[in-house]
Amino acid sequence: MNVRDHTKEFNVPTNTRKHHDIFPQNIFCVIAGSTGSGKTNLLVHLLKKEKLLNYNHIYVYSATLHQPAYAHLREYYGTLEKQIQQELNQSIQIAHFFEADNQIQNPSELDTNKNHVMIFDDVMMEHQDIIKQYFCQGRHNNVNVFYLCQSLHTIAKHCIRDNANVFILFRQDDKTLKYFHETHISGDMDFSEFKQFCDGAWKKKHGCVVINIWD
């Protein structure tokens, strides 16, 4: 049966520009690693690297906004916002920073004509339901999510782990790595091969493994 492609006729939000080809159109990323592993430094790199991520606004929810990485981002975006204001003669806010216990904005409230990056770093457990909504419904609102955690076991399987399409793993213990292999990798390689691959990456300082689970 020949099926006509009607998707171009659908009234859906559009991304005018895509991310770099290494990422899917909408990113739902879990970054897992212990304290000091390099999670936040990697996040800063992703946000600042030219032509890597396409976004109009970022929202950061973190219990550790006092750490140097977020202080640096505040200064970086503050300078950028001032430059844009001078050039375009209009006020603009790109970056929004919130303590982890603040009420998280509902994804349905975001402007679907803009690209958004949501960052959840060490957020309170009572906010997990709204974060699940971002992983389940975010693509309809041009949302990209980066969820930073110390352990994959602390992440709700339903919605978050099941809908994540990118995993960035810093060093994990064998139990956690085996669990991740069983749920995401076992169809592509056996555990010993996967562990060898990860160990090779983790030998480097702040080394990590990036796993894209998307077509």
Model regions: which residues?
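Conserved AAA+ ATPase small/helical "lid" subdomain
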Residues: D188-D215
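An amphipathic, basic-hydrophobic helix/alpha-beta surface used to engage anionic
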Residues: I58
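Short secondary-structure boundary/capping segments
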Residues: H20-D21, E109, G200
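Electropositive nucleic-acid engagement tracts
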Residues: L80-E81
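Pre-Walker A adenine-sensing motif
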Residues: D5-F23, V44
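Conserved P-loop NTPase motor cores
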Residues: I27-L53, A63-P68, R74, Q85, ...
